A protein has these predicted regions:
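Sec-dependent signal peptide recognition
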Residues: 2-9
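C-terminal motif of bacterial Sec signal peptides marking the signal peptidase cleavage site
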Residues: 12-15
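Bacterial signal peptide processing site
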Residues: 17-20
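Ser/Thr-rich, Proline-interspersed low-complexity disordered segments
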Residues: 22-48, 215-221
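A short glycine-rich, His/Asp/Glu-containing loop-to-beta-strand
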Residues: 39-74, 111-144, 204
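Short acidic-glycine-tyrosine-enriched beta hairpin
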Residues: 59-99, 139, 167-186
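Ligand-binding loop in jelly-roll beta-barrel domains
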Residues: 86-110, 185-212
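His-enriched metal-coordination microenvironments in redox/metal-binding proteins
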Residues: 148-152, 157
Length: 221
């Protein structure tokens, strides 16, 4: 928070000369009251942890084996995979996408190079069986998701509109069409539509097999 110090204004008053031999009394300048400007903090908007005007649809879901525990990254690309990796889904007549989770060495692969959104390198997933999925999320104007957290990693691409992402331990982020974000396991998150129209996001997730996709929370992040 910036603080604006008081600005002190000084006024200089001059003495006036009188008629004949009678001199006018001198006037002692009186300092004016200090003028100050105060900056008042605007409280951040608060949101109910309950969902409103929100729908989520599973487009595709399939098992995935992670053979070794290593750092990785998620990517989302338009169209289908050139090498058959990841999960692919059609969102609309003009929109289809593929997404996957790979190790950093795969950043040079054709799919990753053509990606619309790539996450940075993420903490390692434990070796084991997982479920990969793509979901289409639609949030009406003024709507929001519930406050929740995930059992796995999410990579999210904004397909339409403007959204505000609030997550535990991070500053709120406003994103528009074509931008993306990621969420690590067990991090509280809430998605709010701050645009004037409908917002759509494509959600790629890789979650431990058998674990709940998400868990609702009673408090907003």
């Amino acid at each position: 928070m910036r603080h604006i110090g008081a600005i002190v204004l000084g006024l200089l008053l001059g003495a006036c000369g009188g008629a004949g031999s009678v001199s006018a009394p001198s006037v002692t300048p009186q300092p004016s009251a200090p003028a100050s400007a105060a900056v008042v903090a605007t409280p951040a908007p608060t949101y109910s942890p309950k969902a409103e005007g929100f729908t989520s649809k599973v487009l595709v879901e399939k098992p995935r084996e992670v053979a070794t525990s290593a750092a990785g990254f998620a990517w989302i690309a338009a169209g289908t995979s050139t090498v058959g990796k990841g999960v692919t889904a059609t969102v609309s007549e003009k929109e289809s996408f593929t997404a996957s989770y790979e190790t950093p060495i795969d950043r040079q692969a054709a799919d990753a190079k053509q990606a619309i959104y790539l996450t940075p390198d993420l903490p390692p997933l434990a070796a084991g069986r997982y479920t990969e999925s793509l979901r289409l999320v639609v949030v009406q104007a003024g709507g929001r998701s519930s406050a929740h957290m995930h059992s796995g990693i999410e990579g999210v691409l904004v397909l339409e509109g403007q959204v505000l992402v609030r997550s535990g331990g991070n500053a709120p982020a406003s994103l528009v069409t074509g931008q993306g974000f990621f969420i690590l396991p067990k991090v509280p998150v809430q998605l709010i539509n701050v645009g004037s129209g409908v917002a759509r996001t494509l959600v790629y997730s890789i979650s431990p097999e058998g674990a709940p996709f998400s868990t609702e929370l009673t408090e907003s992040p």
